[in-house]
Amino acid sequence: VIMEQFEPEQYLALVERYQVTHSQLVPTMFSRMLKLPDEVRHKYDRSTLEIAIHAAAPCPVQVKEQMIDWWGPIIHEYYGATEGLGFTACDSAQWLAHKGSVGKVMIGDLHILDENMQPAPKGTPGEIWFKTATPFEYFNDPDRTQQTRSADGTMSTVGDVGYVDDDG
């Protein structure tokens, strides 16, 4: 089901009407649904919804906690980029054990580097870089491509910041 624009109550009605099993959302959609009155939030049957995936922006811890409380442990999160550098993922249980996490690396070789391109200590934020088999290139824009590559050309970034904890 594709919505022309997101309206929180309409989304819930469509889940019920079409017995949606899987849905892709962004954190803003969660926030908007959580602002609905309780009677509206609980008016629609979501029992067919098995997996709700979210990405595209950081999800505030409080919002995700409230969504898991409301929908149960069906919420999954991933981090990646259109450029295809790498991919991390976590389910509700993994997230609850590490609130704020975007999961463990599933694809790519992750490196968190400081401003000197040195590995950042565990728990210290740094720029997210991935070493991939096929680095991406911006179409007809070699200067921009060069800005997103390590000096040796083996790693790429989109400029996001993150950190790795002791559990990876």
What is the meaning of each model-derived region?
Residues Q5, V20, K99, M155-V158:
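Conserved loop-to-helix N-cap of the C-terminal "lid" that shapes the substrate pocket in Rossmann-like
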